[in-house]
């Protein structure tokens, strides 16, 4: 696991390198530029149509976006895997979840027709798509491959 997590300040937009040790100890990091508290979580973040741009498109890290719905059994099956990946990939990948029933604009933007769907995005651009419940090893393999690709090779 990396030694630091990159966290963008919601107030001034500065990218801050926060040691994972500090996060694991429950210490509250502050922005180096404006001194406001930084949002810290090794859990997936909840993304909405309204927050997609700030949370995903402007993320300094690649994003694994889990598109799901409450009624979807396979979505519930992979949810613990997505949570594990959020912890294991902290500092390398931002993991986010978007409920497609509550956020149809973003779901339509990416032409989501089947869930669960996991998208790997860089600067809001889709790099890879995994549809259906897959084992953690396959998701991790595809995620590692996608984040190593140059951004210009997106779909």
Model-derived features with residue positions:
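Thiol-based oxidoreductase modules, predominantly thioredoxin-like and allied folds used
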Residues: 79-105, 112
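Short linker/helix segments within small regulatory modules
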Residues: 18-29
